[in-house]
Amino acid sequence: MPMDKTFNAAEAEARLYDAWEKAGAFRAGANASRPETFCIMIPPPNVTGSLHMGHAFNNTLQDILTRWHRMRGFDTLWQPGQDHAGIATQMVVERELARAGNPGRREMGREAFLEKVWEWKEQSGGTIVNQLKRLGASCDWSRNAFTMDPNFQRAVLKVFVDLYEKGFIYRGKRLVNWDPHFETAISDLEVEQVEVNGNMWRLRYQLADGATYRHPVAFDEEGRPTEWEERDYLTVATTRPETMLGDTGIAVNPSDERYAHLIGKEVVLPLVGRRIPIVADDYADPSKGTGAVKITPAHDFNDWGVGQRTGLRAINVMSGRATMFLIENPDFTEGCAPSEEALALDGLDRYEARKRVVALAEEQGWLDGIDQDRHMVPHGDRSKVAIEPMLTDQWFVDTAQIVQPAIDAVRTGRTEILPERDAKTYFHWLENIEPWCISRQLWWGHQIPVWYGLDIWPARFEDDGDDTLDEVEIFELLEDGAFNHADPTHHCAFDFEGVSEKFLDDLASLPHPLNNARVVEVASRAEAIDRLAQALADYNLNEDPTHLVYPVWRDPDVLDTWFSSGLWPIGTLGWPEETPELARYFPTNVLITGFDIIFFWVARMMMMQLAVVNEVPFKTVYVHALVRDEKGKKMSKSLGNVLDPLELIDEFGADAVRFTLTAMAAMGRDLKLSTARIQGYRNFGTKLWNACRFAEMNGVWEGHGTQAAPPAATATVNRWIIGETGRVREEVDAALAAYRFDSAANALYAFVWGKVCDWYVEFSKPLFDTEAAAETRATMGWVLDQCMVLLHPIMPFITEDLWATTGSRTKMLVHTDWPSFGAELVDPAADREMSWVISLIEEIRSARAQVHVPAGLKLPVVQLALDAAGREALARNEALILRLARLEGFTEAASAPKGALTIAVEGGSFAIPLEGVIDIGAEKARLAKTLEKLEKDMAGLRGRLGNPNFVASAPEEVVDEARTRLEQGEEEGAKLSAALARLSEIA
């Protein structure tokens, strides 16, 4: 069956992928022929996710490495999977429930809601898997993992318990990013900075105890004060006046002469009446604002740091919904008598409270002024609501105790991070690490394996000493309501059975009948109080200890998704079970990831794997850059410059998208992606297809079979292309081994399009009518086979389709052996001769183009001087040179005729007479005018780029564009100058 005229990507891609899957082509160990393993873990996309350009880029690079190793016979596993994406998934399901008019999460309860989440996951959670298949990702989908799979849950809970028991996990109060919409702590990665128009309010805080000071109000030219006024207040500036209710200090710089003598004194907080100290801290900048900074440790990360250094209290004045929490807040009222106006703010939304505080400040005379201010405000990336720094009780990993092995592993080379600059980022983060908040106030996720009970130990009741609670003692305990005020006590265990044993051990030390109580699980503290009181009341009636219960309730929070995904390498391979896969594929070979999650994911995987199994999770981390638009701008919906990879695949085919991303994947350099580039690489695929059709028309595929070794060749052209094939194989392998994906792609592009399609196909045409025809068919078939094999990791679809169409194959291309030949195939004589021929043709073509010789016009050429090797090469290839350089014939002369253009090649020179062919004077004038305009433009660009202010202040993409234009202009200028120089030789 003859080949189609063109490759139909839309039809072929689904058909070929289905064939690969049916053949088990991607399963772990498929095509393995050597003992070495290669394992790579997919960075698990969110189960809610859809394929974006970052996914497409990342997974293209992973697939290239996977297919390359699989074809080389490695026991290969590309482990796929999805992250349960706690907050994102919960948001999606809640939105779906609301859209369908169903009860909300809180109305239906936790268990019913989680059932709905699992239903959604089964119905809609596989979207990104199918999209990755469209890209051509050759993952072992039979092993597709999910971070909420039963085995993964066991791994996560086991690690939590182990780290807790080692003292690496603790519960404490710290400042966190709080999303008031979802009412949960979120990670820094889930926070986006939004620039907003706002105000800077200046507030006056009265000095306590009648204190005053001299404040400078006028200055000379050198900034020295010349006039002062007596003040009994300090002025502070804030963009968030509502937080002043939680102020616990004023910070001034210890070197600030205006305030140095006030350090240690106090001010009285307006509305609240709280006396707060003036403290010294370098955070206060004398050159900014008034130099005095209000400190609210519970609602600002910088203020928290000041508070920790200076011993200030932290008073939270907001609820989880970002409403003011004042009246029933003992921290707020402690040590002061808030005014009625302050207490009236209780329950107000933070923004309403802001308006009211400003109004009160103006009414009462402590508003010093208002300045318009444009500043950055952190927002939740999903809720789009302003984040509130919030002091809350959370679970933390004491990362300082487990971080050092992760630092040492990279420093000693157990794990290599590429490029090197990202290793520096890794070290910077880990060497300045803070405790990691791992609890989230969500329902979807790994519920924290901690249970709480009421502290009813001896301090909570009175026993007459007989080690038994009698009826009166129990009655007094119930009547006293001690349970309502009992502190919680807690234990951590893998499951309820394990935690029950720990609570039973505690109960054993209590008086009878409490020491006989059964541990039962309830939903909340309130239910625990009721159940315990009811059980004791019943015991007083029937004295049957078998009915006595001690209720415990589980921590409702779930773990940060980065905690579970931090176990991705070992969890997907079966840990904590000692599976064959874990023994065979761990540690994995390489992780390919984006720079934005080096800390959030990569560093945490390093820390956790080393803490849990004392092994690094991967030997290499390759950090790729961002995919930007063609102007270098970050893609965003607001800019309207987002390129959808699925739409690009629909339009250009997956191979073109993949090759574009690969060819532009220079290590550490962002990609500037354009549809024009993708279209160009689609044309590259078409070029290969057409070369195979040319081969078909010349009988190359008749009886053709796969041959590892090249055919024996005598024709110079065939010997030359066989050597070039050996060279490019070595180049590709060296590039991929060093993660220089762009070098591999560009080497293949230059070889397939340039050497094979442009030169070899043209050189071979005359040979099909000679005695070298059979040899040429065999050589062309072998060379095109190698093109398919070498291109397959980057362009899997078109190469697999060509492979099946162009001969009798014993197995699919995906499992065809990768070649091992190399530069030993190079024939020096053939290489030298054909390189000389190509150089001569290219020089003639370039000269013609530079001076605008009409493309179809055949010119005479004069041989001036030529060594013996050149004469032999010319004699053997004269017909080729005349045809491909569009020449009418060669003559020989001692010197160049008048009006001729000279061309130098190795071993000699030639001349092309141009008199009467072009108007040399007019052409020189045209070139000079074009060059003059170009040089003027280049001078402007050099001036801009030489201006430090432009380079420092202009957007990065604008500077990059200017540099690119200058580089392109300089290249064009060099070509124009060369053309002028050629014409000057003639005149």
Swiss-Prot record:
Coiled coil spans: 917-985
Q: Enumerate the Gene Ontology biological process terms.
A: valyl-tRNA aminoacylation
Amino-acid biosynthesis keyword on record = no
Annotated ATP binding lies at K637
Protein name as it appears in the record: Valine--tRNA ligase
Q: Which organism is it from?
A: Cereibacter sphaeroides (strain ATCC 17029 / ATH 2.4.9) (Rhodobacter sphaeroides)
Designated gene of the protein? valS
InterPro entries, alphabetized: aa-tRNA-synth_I_CS, aa-tRNA-synth_Ia, Anticodon_Ia_Val, M/V/L/I-tRNA-synth_anticd-bd, Rossmann-like_a/b/a_fold, tRNA-bd_arm, tRNAsynth_Ia_anticodon-bd, Val-tRNA_synth_C_sf
Q: Kindly list the organism's lineage.
A: Bacteria, Pseudomonadati, Pseudomonadota, Alphaproteobacteria, Rhodobacterales
Annotated keywords: Aminoacyl-tRNA synthetase, ATP-binding, Coiled coil, Cytoplasm, Ligase, Nucleotide-binding, Protein biosynthesis
